[in-house]
Amino acid sequence: MKQYDAIIIGFGKGGKLLTAELAERNWKVAIVERSPQMYGGTCVNVGCIPTKALIHESEYAEKRYYDDYKNQSKLYALAVARKDKLVSFLREKNYENVKNKPNITLYDGTASFLSENTIRIVSGKDETILEGKE
């Protein structure tokens, strides 16, 4: 069983900020995220940012090809590709901000509580048990 001062479940805005703050205070911190495709949380990956990127692209298409829906539809694949590139860039930045920091260990998998201070992480067929103080 691996021991940590704190175990943070979720690599979203709150989780990543709390993890970084505790690590700066020399706490040994584990952060758990279900999927590498969600580093940075909902806003970065499937919420605010991709939605706003697609809205921006659609507004551009409408201005450029006002009533020409055939040409607007051609820009759809390009808009999705740009959105995907932006999300991938931001996800990677979030990962880089954590991966090289001392005192932080990132785990990919589904976390569940075994007790008040004990967490089980399941990733495929692998299972890891962590114990935290806080």
List the predicted regions and their residue ranges.
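The conserved SAM/SAH-binding core of class I Rossmann-like methyltransferase domains
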Residues: I9, V32-E33
